[in-house]
């Protein structure tokens, strides 16, 4: 399972509820993008969430 290397966001799980409140399992996936960033001074291709990219927590190479 892919995981954001900056914020640690990954797929989360919970219940989908019908109108009658029956529960079935579902998952929420973060919007992960594979981008090149500097890791320890070297460019590396890693998974980063779109939220981290938009907020400026990471800059592309």
Swiss-Prot record:
Keywords linked to the UniProt accession: Ribonucleoprotein, Ribosomal protein
Domain of life: Bacteria
GO MF assignments: structural constituent of ribosome
Entry's Gene Ontology BP terms: translation
Record InterPro entries: Bacterial_rp_bL28 (IPR050096), Ribosomal_bL28 (IPR026569), Ribosomal_bL28/bL31-like_sf (IPR034704), Ribosomal_bL28_bact-type (IPR001383), Ribosomal_bL28_sf (IPR037147)
Gene3D superfamilies in UniProt: Ribosomal protein L28/L24
One cellular component term from this protein's GO annotations in UniProt: ribosome
Region feature Disordered, mapped onto this chain: 1-26
PANTHER family reported in the protein's UniProt record: 50S RIBOSOMAL PROTEIN L28 (PTHR39080), LARGE RIBOSOMAL SUBUNIT PROTEIN BL28A (PTHR39080:SF1)
Protein family: Belongs to the bacterial ribosomal protein bL28 family.
Entry protein name: Large ribosomal subunit protein bL28
Source organism: Latilactobacillus sakei subsp. sakei (strain 23K)
Lineage: Bacteria, Bacillati, Bacillota, Bacilli, Lactobacillales
